[in-house]
Swiss-Prot record:
This is Serine--tRNA ligase. The keyword ATP-binding applies. The keyword Protein biosynthesis applies. ATP binds at residues 264-266, 351-354. It comes from the Bacteria. Consists of two distinct domains, a catalytic core and a N-terminal extension that is involved in tRNA binding. GO terms for biological process: selenocysteine biosynthetic process; seryl-tRNA aminoacylation. Keywords: Aminoacyl-tRNA synthetase, ATP-binding, Cytoplasm, Ligase, Nucleotide-binding, Protein biosynthesis. HAMAP family: Ser_tRNA_synth_type1. It catalyses: tRNA(Ser) + L-serine + ATP = L-seryl-tRNA(Ser) + AMP + diphosphate + H(+); tRNA(Sec) + L-serine + ATP = L-seryl-tRNA(Sec) + AMP + diphosphate + H(+). It comes from Clostridium kluyveri (strain ATCC 8527 / DSM 555 / NBRC 12016 / NCIMB 10680 / K1). Belongs to the class-II aminoacyl-tRNA synthetase family. Type-1 seryl-tRNA synthetase subfamily. The lineage of its organism: Bacteria, Bacillati, Bacillota, Clostridia, Eubacteriales. Its main location: cytoplasm.
Length: 426
């Protein structure tokens, strides 16, 4: 959520920034929220004046009664003042609801460092690591490799649950588990994150807090007859961990790593990545979440991105980092990097991690602040997160980049201890 004061002080600049995002966004609601805010502030002035008058009348009534006089006229007048205050309170409640409705639907403002552009083709490549994998044979797609090795079962996944569901079996399930353990060990032992195991269901308030709702409700799985949602990412429960709390400045930055299943309806992805395990309704992911002071947050974003890169480097899979342009930025981020791994069957890089700084956008929605000292006024923190990284896409990248001409797949060196010393899946 944006700072309403920021909108009030410079509505035209806010509209310009939102227009630059390329969002399908009705700019007139900025004028609407400014108008509502002005009306609210005028009413608050009136209410304050009425409360002062009520206090004065109350004191005068007490004085008259102590003197044995008749204060009936003042009592009637004070009752009318109280009734007026109640009416204003009703108006204020209605205006506050309207303001909140609008504010929850206004996206974040891009950081000045975000590149111009509207499509993913406008994203700016920052760096690459390793050259794309070359083969002396025609490489297969990961769905064919997994099916041939009997480690991925798409047909039975479809039978049991429907499209975009997959059974991992045998060494496929072992590989997934190995990757999770490797990622968690690396981030906790090498990068200093605290591991946290979150709930897989959250309430509506939590989904609103991180920005999934109200805009993306059609992409969420809601539990029938209840206002719980299956989490689309561990970002939701972990960011809400400190909701309505004031943290100590000396404790920041705080870093968590969380493994969870993730559930997404993929309502806007019809026809995209229909084969394989790149885009599933249920998938596993290791998530990195940080809470930082404003002056720390962009340094922490670089560190978070490097942390996600490190685990991919350990697997020796070619990747690149791109800075996301304004039109591809998403609803909540102020600046975002994508890490994309090389996928031979696609003959291109495919996203495996997004690393974002939300500045105070989420913190205002979930009400997380910090104090440098107990006497200081609380300030909103900055929140950051990134995939550290997606497990299913890692499996796909390993199958494609480590495949051999006989149909087998070599196991990355760093995963061998987690795979019982095995060197190959065949």
């Amino acid at each position: 959520m944006l700072d309403l004061k920021r909108i009030r002080n410079n509505p035209e600049e806010i509209k310009k920034q939102l227009l630059n995002r390329g969002e399908d966004f009705e700019l007139s609601i900025i004028d609407k929220v400014v108008s509502l805010d002005e009306k609210r502030r005028k009413i608050l002035v009136e209410v304050e004046a009425l409360k002062n008058k009520r206090n004065q009348d109350s004191g005068e009534i007490a004085k008259i009664k102590r003197a044995g006089g008749n204060a009936d006229t003042l009592v009637v007048e004070m009752k009318q003042v109280s009734d007026n205050i109640k009416q204003y309170d009703i108006q204020l409640s209605e205006i506050n609801d309207k303001i909140e409705y609008i504010m929850l639907r206004i996206p974040n403002i891009p950081n000045p460092a975000v590149p111009e552009g509207k499509l993913d083709e406008d994203n700016v490549e920052i760096r690459r690591w390793m050259e794309p994998t070359k083969f002396k044979f025609q490489p297969k797609a990961h769905w064919d490799i997994g099916t041939n090795l009997n480690i991925l079962d798409f047909e039975r996944g479809g039978k049991v649950a429907g499209s975009r569901f997959t059974f991992y079996r045998g060494l496929g399930a072992r590989l997934e588990r190995a990757i999770v353990s490797y990622y968690l060990d690396f981030h906790t032992e090498k990068h200093g994150y605290e591991e946290i195991l979150p709930p897989y269901m959250v309430n509506r308030t939590s989904m609103i807090g991180t920005g999934q709702l109200p805009k993306f409700e059609e992409d969420a799985f809601r539990v029938a007859n209840n206002d719980f949602f299956l989490i689309p990412t561990a970002e939701v429960p972990v960011t809400n961990f400190y909701r309505n709390e004031v943290l100590k400045g000396e404790d920041l930055p705080i870093k968590y790593v969380a493994y969870s299943a993730c559930f997404r309806a993929e309502a806007g992805s019809a026809g995209r990545d229909t084969r394989g395990i790149i885009r599933q309704h249920q998938f596993n992911k290791v998530e990195l979440v940080k809470f930082a002071k404003p002056e720390q947050s962009y340094d922490e974003l670089e560190k978070l991105t490097n942390d996600a890169e490190d685990v991919i480097k350990g697997l020796k899979i070619p990747y690149r980092v791109v800075k996301i342009c304004k039109g591809d930025l998403g609803f909540t981020a102020a600046l975002k990097y994508d890490i994309e791994v090389w996928m031979p069957s696609y003959n291109r890089y495919v996203e495996i991690s997004s690393c974002s700084n939300f500045e105070d956008f989420q913190a205002r929605r979930v009400n997380i602040k910090y104090k440098e000292t107990p006497k200081d006024k609380p300030k909103y923190i900055h929140t950051l997160n990134g995939s550290g990284v997606a497990i299913g896409r890692t499996v796909a990248a390993i199958l494609e980049n480590y495949q051999q001409d006989d149909g087998s797949v070599l196991i990355p060196e760093i995963l061998k201890p987690y795979m019982g010393g095995r060197e190959v899946i065949k």
